[in-house]
Amino acid sequence: MVERTIRILIAKPGLDGHDRGAKVIARALRDAGFEVVYTGLRQTPQMIAEAALQEDVDVVGLSILSGAHMTLVPEIRKAMDAAELADVPMIIGGIIPDDDRPKLEAMGVRGIFGPGAETEAIAAHIRHIVLSSAES
C-alpha cells in the first residue's frame, strides 16, 4: 500500500497577531513529510473553511493564543460544516485551559497541543487521525 502525502491547513483565526508558533509547526510538519498550507494571520472562519475546501486538506490545524478558542472553534466548525467539510478533523495548538479541553473535544476537536508539545508527537497524532478517518 502506497502512503499518500497528508495535507494540513494551518490557520491563525481571529485577531491574534502571534504567528511564530504556527510557522514553527508548519515548518516542522513540512519537514516530517506533510504538505502544509499556511493561511497567515487574522483569518475569519469563512476564510479558513474556504481555504480548507479549495486546498482539499485532510486536517485543519488552528493556532489560537488569544484565549478566544471557545468562541472561534464553534464558528469555524459551523463554517466548515456549511462548506460540507464536517468530516475534516480539526486540531488546535495554543494556550488552552484544561477545563476547556473536554468542551472543545465535544465540539469535534481531535487534538489539543499546548506550548512545548513535541512536533514528532503532533505529526504522529495527525497521521493517526487521518488513518482512523480513512478507515471509518
Each model region followed by its residue ranges:
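Basic/polar N-terminal segments that are highly enriched at the extreme N-terminus
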Residues: 1-2, 134-136
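N-terminal pre-triad scaffold of radical SAM enzymes
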Residues: 11-15
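Cofactor-cradling patches in redox/metallo enzymes
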Residues: 22-132
